[in-house]
Swiss-Prot record:
This is Glycerol-3-phosphate acyltransferase. It comes from Shigella flexneri. It is found in: Cell inner membrane. One of its GO terms (cellular component) is plasma membrane. A motif (HXXXXD motif) lies at residues 326-331. It catalyses: sn-glycerol 3-phosphate + an acyl-CoA = a 1-acyl-sn-glycero-3-phosphate + CoA. Its main location: membrane. The gene is plsB. SUPFAM superfamilies: Glycerol-3-phosphate (1)-acyltransferase (SSF69593). Belongs to the GPAT/DAPAT family.
Amino acid sequence: MTFCYPCRAFALLTRGFTSFMSGWPRIYYKLLNLPLSILVKSKSIPADPAPELGLDTSRPIMYVLPYNSKADLLTLRAQCLAHDLPDPLEPLEIDGTLLPRYVFIHGGPRVFTYYTPKEESIKLFHDYLDLHRSNPNLDVQMVPVSVMFGRAPGREKGEVNPPLRMLNGVQKFFAVLWLGRDSFVRFSPSVSLRRMADEHGTDKTIAQKLARVARMHFARQRLAAVGPRLPARQDLFNKLLASRAIAKAVEDEARSKKISHEKAQQNAIALMEEIAANFSYEMIRLTDRILGFTWNRFYQGINVHNAERVRQLAHDGHELVYVPCHRSHMDYLLLSYVLYHQGLVPPHIAAGINLNFWPAGPIFRRLGAFFIRRTFKGNKLYSTVFREYLGELFSRGYSVEYFVEGGRSRTGRLLDPKTGTLSMTIQAMLRGGTRPITLIPIYIGYEHVMEVGTYAKELRGATKEKESLPQMLRGLSKLRNLGQGYVNFGEPMPLMTYLNQHVPDWRESIDPIEAVRPAWLTPTVNNIAADLMVRINNAGAANAMNLCCTALLASRQRSLTREQLTEQLNCYLDLMRNVPYSTDSTVPSASASELIDHALQMNKFEVEKDTIGDIIILPREQAVLMTYYRNNIAHMLVLPSLMAAIVTQHRHISRDVLMEHVNVLYPMLKAELFLRWDRDELPDVIDALANEMQRQGLITLQDDELHINPAHSRTLQLLAAGARETLQRYAITFWLLSANPSINRGTLEKESRTVAQRLSVLHGINAPEFFDKAVFSSLVLTLRDEGYISDSGDAEPAETMKVYQLLAELITSDVRLTIESATQGEG
């Protein structure tokens, strides 16, 4: 059905839907826009809608808003104009017909409830669909947009009206007045009306269905942005106390400690007080202002990637569990800030009990932190209360965040995962909840980590300083230029899908009352944890600092001319761009020269100038600290570095022999650095890397052999140096195993560390993780898994010597002699 233009123009004029540039509506909107421009400072989600959502501005675009609000419409208009999107107040002209560029799904409430305007959305949808019927080349992009002023979820008690209600004019005025600077314009992926018309038709029932689906979309979107209501804290405690698991634990506590039931119950309440968050939207708003100021002053930018996939999961009703790597105490604040600005609910965060000091503890608690002790051993009541609290968060639909590494990485590499909280997450699923739980791995990276100096001291044996107010103030006083931050969301892991694939009968273990530990739980949790670490590394972010540190630390003198550094960075960048580590990893778009200029602004390097040019130097006192940043991306370059080391040593080598060498060493590298490839994927990866190294001129390919190219030998040697220290560590352990096949695990780890420390001193190895206990412990476990150490604990001497000989070829002769002489007690 179509309307003549005069009738339509009259209808649009009476509803105020006419062009912004004509008649009294122009005056009306200008007058309304004046206070809004002062009161409202909205943010767009996503930050750049057109490219991030794939909008084609050369094709018609119409906007769909949830309900009639001129304030929302003008707020949308401001964001559209700021991002070069069509003005929603300019009508669309299609085949001589003028149509509004925006549609309100619902007329919205009024101050005077007896006045209910006729809804126009169905009629307008039908008009648009009808035009697609008559014009087969037409394809209008329908973009759902919601404008939110404030995102308080409200409390379960004490509110007559639900927090997601539509506002009438007076309510909207006060919302804009109070929350105008806490407003978001959320653009959703577009819907093709051409596809709708082709697949479903163009009659009025389809228009009605479109309006109904749009209503559901906006309701889900607001719930994803605001979250479920918050409980009164005491009501939550009462519910937990009434649970069968805690009631039984209280009885056991009273019996084992020979105390009264009331005293045991008080102990349980005290633990709840210690653990539970006290979420406050007003604290979120205040902290958002402070953090916004902090990021703008000290950081040069926060780079966020792949957030749309998380927004979609939240929109689809998934229970989100954020699992980031842990670099710094700043992670807590940065991730909550990023999620809030991506239109998502800040999560409840599992924080170490060491952060529960005044004033940080109460502040973190109001920002959603719940506190967890380092160990649950020996305290059944505590473990039960914590598990029930975590399960209650899941059952109520709150997003949760925890650091699967258990603590901050002191080396810049991922730590082996701690699986306790992850195990409780799966146990929560076994209560039979209806919402699917999805784990979101997250890579967090920085160009400057405030605690990196402290980490280096701790790795050298210093006692960890207890977190306190003075320590926090000292840290804040050192804030300077922190460069850029990176938050990359990795590939989500839907737990239900994972369990269906790997434990098909997992539903048989569901118990809505008791926490269960089926036989499959521990191995499954371990596999999930390892997979999560791989997915975190898959989302790695290369940046100016970690690339420059990688190159300078590869140089034995920790210095390169600017030309050499530029050439080396180009090598790294081309490898990462042309043979990406994964589809989720990110590489700077800037040139090598621009990255060097940026890194020099961080004041970590020195520059000496002479008549020939600049020499960029990494000072000795900074070298140990800079290994942290190199290690952030070690996994992204270790395979090409290993290939370069093998080719450099042999001068020329066939692809098959190269593949054999890599295949021997890869299991250790995969376990240590959580690499993404399985063994059967290596041939294709090595071929791709070899072709890229040939393209760069680092090697030549002749008759299926890789030959070193003397013209670029320095670049190849610096690339090879990225694997140097790792290969030296492996050589230490394999030599010790070969020399003493019956050595026990503890002694092997201890002696490996002793030799590594000796090597570090004698050969100027600056990396603290070179003799880190955890690294050698992980290596020895991998050797057992790979069969180098038998079930009885003895090594297989023939196999270990074979691997040592391979490694001995890849390390320098002086390092090899130091390793071999150390076991003989020689100097």
